[in-house]
């Protein structure tokens, strides 16, 4: 049995909207709405999230209800026309000549007043024997000569307010200690961070003795084309086996891309399945090093071709040497006096010289007063 009786809820009274009798008032009402784009703040979050379906339903209902009202709403939109200039929007000098107008104007500061007084003193106070009045600023004023105040006409060394720099642009230079942070250069990380007094730079540097060597060799500042060469992949292949240190015999390659002789690898893997170089587990997997074999074969062919070229060059040099010797002897003979071409002509010349001597002797015997003449006279006397 219920001791307390619950009261029944009454329905809310239905309020009927009053219809406006005048249609002219509705037409005269114009709403001015400015569309604002709401910016969502990522820091503000709500626990209530609506489903996509409910959001679509709400939006559709709102659009249907407001479709009739939006017909008479004047929407104010803001648009800005482009300037049509391809250059920057700021000044052409990028603000290099912009001035700071916070301080006192240069025409009214203490420096300007000092300069005006000095100019008046130079022009002179007296004119036609009369003293001219030029303001209270000249009471007791004297032309500053050979003094610190007079020499410092710029005003930067005087006592009093100093004229501040007018331009906004400034150049800031960070002067680091002449040392490089070793941790940052090697690892790229420093525990001190931005408070480290050493330079955080990972670029390469040269020692002083290296620069001196380049300067003495005449290579200082010259670019080496070899620094920009892209080497082929053949340079990555080793020349000898890592285990035995000898040239490869039936080379194999492991999973970690290391090359060994077949016999050396089998002996090493009997003790441990780890790679002797990188200590990774190879799982005793070995493959034939086809790339290494092709590289070694191509290298042998290149060496053979180079040896043949060297032999050909040596042979050509040997052939050129005898010709050079012949030319040398030829030049020597040209310096010597000319000799008869054939040796057979030498005795003929000697015979000719003997005949000439005999003829000469006969002529001498035929002369008067000679020995032959006396003998002939004796013979004639005996006959008689």
Swiss-Prot record:
It catalyses: S-ubiquitinyl-[E2 ubiquitin-conjugating enzyme]-L-cysteine + [acceptor protein]-L-lysine = [E2 ubiquitin-conjugating enzyme]-L-cysteine + N(6)-ubiquitinyl-[acceptor protein]-L-lysine. PROSITE patterns: ZF_C3H1 (PS50103), ZF_RING_1 (PS00518), ZF_RING_2 (PS50089). It comes from the Eukaryota. A zinc finger (RING-type) spans 241-279. Residues 60-71, 351-384 have a biased composition (Acidic residues). Residues 1-11 have a biased composition (Basic residues). This is Probable E3 ubiquitin-protein ligase rnf113. The gene is rnf-113.
């Amino acid at each position: 049995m219920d001791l307390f009786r619950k009261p029944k809820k009454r329905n809310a009274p239905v309020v009927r909207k009053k219809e406006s009798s005048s249609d002219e008032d509705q037409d005269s009402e114009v709403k001015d709405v400015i569309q604002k784009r709401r910016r969502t703040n990522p820091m503000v979050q709500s626990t209530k999230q609506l489903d996509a379906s409910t959001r679509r339903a709400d939006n559709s209902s709102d659009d249907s209800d407001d479709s009739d009202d939006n017909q008479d709403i004047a929407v104010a939109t803001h648009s800005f026309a482009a300037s049509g200039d391809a250059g920057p929007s700021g000044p052409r000098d990028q603000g290099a000549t912009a001035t700071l107008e916070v301080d006192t104007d240069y025409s009214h500061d203490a420096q300007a007043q000092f300069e005006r007084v000095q100019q008046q003193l130079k022009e002179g106070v007296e004119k036609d024997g009369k003293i001219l009045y030029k303001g209270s600023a000249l009471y007791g004023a004297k032309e500053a000569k050979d003094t610190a105040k007079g020499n410092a006409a710029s005003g930067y060394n005087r006592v009093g307010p100093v004229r501040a720099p007018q331009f906004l642009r400034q150049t800031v230079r960070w002067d680091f200690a002449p040392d490089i942070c070793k941790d940052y250069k090697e690892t790229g990380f420093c525990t001190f961070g931005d408070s480290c007094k050493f330079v955080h730079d990972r670029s390469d540097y040269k020692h002083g003795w290296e620069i001196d060597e380049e300067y003495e060799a005449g290579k200082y500042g010259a670019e080496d084309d070899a620094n920009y060469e892209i080497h082929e992949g053949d340079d990555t292949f080793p020349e000898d086996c890592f285990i035995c240190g000898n040239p490869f015999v039936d080379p194999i390659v492991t999973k970690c891309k290391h090359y060994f002789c077949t016999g050396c690898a089998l002996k090493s893997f009997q003790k441990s399945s780890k790679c002797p170089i990188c200590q990774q587990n190879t799982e005793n997997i070995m493959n034939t090093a086809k790339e290494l074999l092709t590289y070694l074969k191509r290298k042998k062919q290149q060496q053979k071709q180079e040896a043949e070229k060297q032999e050909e060059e040596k042979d050509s040099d040997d052939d050129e040497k005898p010709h050079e010797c012949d030319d040398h002897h030829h030049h020597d003979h040209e310096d010597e006096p000319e000799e008869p071409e054939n040796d057979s002509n030498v005795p003929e010349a000697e015979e000719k010289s003997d005949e000439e001597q005999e003829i000469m002797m006969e002529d001498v015997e035929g002369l008067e007063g000679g020995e032959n003449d006396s003998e002939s006279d004796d013979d004639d006397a005996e006959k008689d």
